[in-house]
Structures are given as structure tokens and as C-alpha cells.
Amino acid sequence: MTCKIIGSGGYLPQKIISNDELTKFVDTNDKWIRTRTGIFQRHIAGDTEYTSHLALKSAQKAIEDAMISVDDIDLIITCTTTPDNSFPSVATKLHGYLGLTNIPSFDLQAVCAGFIYGLQLTNSLIVSGKYKTILLIGAEKMTSLLDWNDRSTCVLFGDGAGSVILQRSNDESGLIDSNIFSSGTDYEILYTSGGTSMNGTSGKIVMQGQKLFRHAIAKMLQSIEDLLHANQFSVSDIDYFIPHQANIRIINKLAELLNIEEHKVVKTVEKHANCSAASIPLALSTLKESGKIKKGDILLFSAIGAGLTWGSALIRW
């Protein structure tokens, strides 16, 4: 028994900032950014457009795609690092926006690996029989954490949200397996300079890019290889590889080491930038809207985020 995705939806804010526009207020250029990241634009939420608003718009699309009623949802989980408020949770605010009554809702914080963590948790809750229909969201306003004078970080991130509706599977489709990990001793590789109990501010993103690159390759590769081996899958069985959209060099290096064919690798980082927990569900929504994905396809997700947190998931569509 497992859970399956019956609907998906993504949302990106209307405002787009190109690499050339960034050069107006930070010492960088389009070639430098593209060469090192693969990014040439990012979507930016407005001053009064919060993470909960992004989450709502993606959730509405997923609900419509799943062809269910809002009232069918019996749990909301929002994966986010950038909540509107310290409390209440984004999920609880979304609960109110959707007009739901008394069902549980909460946020999950595993940064860029949040959606993988959320998938594993959602599967356990549905398999337990306690919940039938879960709305799982990755939503981020990462630009609220940026120091726009730091070219090593401000060029990397964007805002957006992706949602999926999951229910129990009655056939072979659904989550095959997943794994998740963390390493708290590596937290200084990627973190924010503030926090509610530390200094009462959200702080700004601080990153050791070279170290993060090495950890990302090693940890995601091991996670993927372990997952494939545990479930007796080979790389050739994968129809689509949807990695966390952090950096084109990480994506390309993983594909090379795994020997995954180019046409199987889903890449949205060039237009979306790094949307943290939203990146995988956004990429999934983009793939689904392209019409390429078909029933029975095997999808491989993998992500790494601050913490460090990381993991992978195998899904049969």
C-alpha cells in the first residue's frame, strides 16, 4: 500500500528579474551568472505577496487538476523556510483561505529537501489509514532572505510554490520508496544569520558555495544509489529525473555520474532559479503541463538543503 499524486499545480509571481537587471545593483554580469549557475531569470514576489499567497495559488491549481472538492482535503502540510509569520503556520493560514473547518494543518521545515521529507511523511500518514486526501505544498519567498549586495547568493534564488494532492493508491502507481537524512554538524555550510530566538530577525542567507557543491554531489548521489539498490531499480528504469533546481552544475554533474540521458533530466533552474522546497513540485508541475509524462513512468526526485538535510524518492506515475 502506498500513496499517489492525483493532482499538481505550480505558481510563480508575475515579476521577473533578469540577470541583466541584477547588474544594476550588484557587481555581476549575465555571463558570470549563467556560467556558474545556469540561471538567467528569477520570479520575485511583491512586497505584499507572501508565502501563503503563493501557496494558495498553487494549491488551487492542484485541487482543480485532481478534480476534487476542497472539502475532500483532510490534512495540509506546507514545506517552507519562509513563513509569513513566526506563527501561525503558513498551512494554517492556507486552511483559512480555503475555508476549511477543523482539519489539521502544519508547516514542515527541511529547507530545500522539504518536499522529499513531506512526501515520506505524507505516505506514512495515508498508509496508516488516518488520512485519505492530503494537500502537500512547497512554497517559498526566498528573496526575503537575500542580501542584495552579496552576488554569491542573491543571484541564486527565486520565489514560487508547487502543490500536490495525494491519496491512497489502489494500483501499482504511487510512491515506491523514499529516504531522508540530515547532518547537523554541517549546518554552517548554509544558514541564515538570524532567527526568532537568536536575534529576533530572519537574517540573510550565508553560504559556503564550494563546500555545498561537494556535499550536494556526494550526498545526493549516495541517496539515489541506495534508493535504487534497495528497490532493485537501475538507472535505465528511470523515465524522468527531477532533482532540486539549485544549480545547473550540480544537476549536470549528478546526471553525468548516474549516466542518466539528457532528455530524461528535468531542468527549470534557468527560469525559476532556486525556489528551495518549491523547486521539485514546480518542476513536476512544469513536466506534467508539457504533456510528456504518462501513466507508468518512473520518476526520481532528489534534493539537498541546509541543515544539512537531503533525500530522494521514487514514484511510479
Curated annotation (Swiss-Prot):
GO terms for molecular function: 3-oxoacyl-[acyl-carrier-protein] synthase activity; beta-ketoacyl-acyl-carrier-protein synthase III activity. Pathway: Lipid metabolism; fatty acid biosynthesis. It catalyses: malonyl-[ACP] + acetyl-CoA + H(+) = 3-oxobutanoyl-[ACP] + CO2 + CoA. It is found in: Cytoplasm. CDD domains: KAS_III (cd00830). Coiled coil: none annotated. GO terms for biological process: fatty acid biosynthetic process; secondary metabolite biosynthetic process. Its main location: cytoplasm. The active site is at 112, 244, 274. Residues 245-249 are annotated as: ACP-binding. One of its GO terms (cellular component) is cytoplasm. Keywords: Acyltransferase, Cytoplasm, Fatty acid biosynthesis, Fatty acid metabolism, Lipid biosynthesis, Lipid metabolism, Multifunctional enzyme, Transferase. NCBIfam families: fabH, PRK09352.1. Homodimer. Catalyzes the condensation reaction of fatty acid synthesis by the addition to an acyl acceptor of two carbons from malonyl-ACP. Catalyzes the first condensation reaction which initiates fatty acid synthesis and may therefore play a role in governing the total rate of fatty acid production. Possesses both acetoacetyl-ACP synthase and acetyl transacylase activities. Its substrate specificity determines the biosynthesis of branched-chain and/or straight-chain of fatty acids. Belongs to the thiolase-like superfamily. FabH family. The last Arg residue of the ACP-binding site is essential for the weak association between ACP/AcpP and FabH. This is Beta-ketoacyl-[acyl-carrier-protein] synthase III. It comes from Rickettsia typhi (strain ATCC VR-144 / Wilmington). The lineage of its organism: Bacteria, Pseudomonadati, Pseudomonadota, Alphaproteobacteria, Rickettsiales. The gene is fabH.
